[in-house]
Regions:
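Helix-to-loop junction immediately C-terminal to a conserved catalytic motif
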Residues: 57
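Helix N-cap at the start of a conserved alpha-helix in ABC-type nucleotide-binding domains
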Residues: 178-180
């Protein structure tokens, strides 16, 4: 496990609350997340795990409290700097969010095209990340023809194509068989070993128990347990 006692927090949450109308999704969450940490966010469905991840990349905005990322206060960030912030993140969505009418290669390339990368660099990078996740031979396939595990591999390739500092993974193994889930975890551990900070939201307690990593437990929007503390 990352020795957090010697680290400076890269993400800081101070008394964060999030409400949707009268419903509270997060209640007074205070948390430090450290550079190159692999953090599990564990809790049942509806606990606030996805909401917490969305707040970090400004997919949602806090109702109260503050979030700082590398010292940047998200409440004060200008519209021009939102894109800069989001480039820090690679996001693995629970439902993959692959475009069915685009090939595997094209789905991964979209991230780099949006960042304005030159075509030659895009070609090289996409081939590299597809090779890293074992999907190079499926580059010209379309998502509907792939298995769930294969689609998740493509989603991971897309998430890491921009060399993000932070990977947010929302239930990345939730719909996969045990063998596919294990291979996805190995991929994420590999990117963590190469320097990425990984935040993984899951309802599966076994995932967290199989790694010597810090786990926080969310229940009904409340941070109840951090282990180890």
């Amino acid at each position: 496990m990352t020795d957090i006692k010697t680290k400076t927090p890269t993400i800081r949450l101070f008394h964060v609350r999030k409400r949707y109308g009268a419903k509270a999704a997060l209640l007074d969450v205070t948390l430090d997340i450290f550079k190159n940490e692999f953090l599990f966010i564990h809790g049942p469905s509806g606990a606030g795990k996805t909401t917490l991840l969305k707040l970090l990349y400004l997919g949602e905005h806090v109702s109260e409290g503050q979030i700082l990322i590398d010292g940047m206060n998200l409440a004060r960030i200008s519209a021009k700097r939102v894109h800069m912030l989001r480039r820090k993140f690679g996001i693995i969505f629970q439902d993959f969010k692959l475009i069915p009418t685009k090939t595997v290669f094209e789905n991964v390339a979209l991230v780099l095209e949006a960042a304005g990368k030159p075509n030659r660099a895009i070609q090289k990078k996409v081939r590299s990340v597809l090779r890293a996740v074992g999907m190079e031979e499926k580059a010209n396939s379309f998502p509907p023809t792939l298995s769930g595990g294969e689609q998740q591999r493509v989603a991971i390739a897309r998430a890491v194509a921009g060399d993000p500092k932070i990977i947010l993974a929302d239930e990345p193994t939730g719909s996969l068989d045990p063998d596919s889930a294990a291979s996805i975890m190995e991929l994420l551990k590999g990117f963590h070993t190469r320097g990425a900070t990984v935040l993984l939201a899951t309802h599966n307690k076994e995932l967290a128990s199989n790694m010597a990593s810090r786990t926080i437990y969310l229940n009904q929007g409340t941070l109840e347990i951090t282990h180890p503390s």
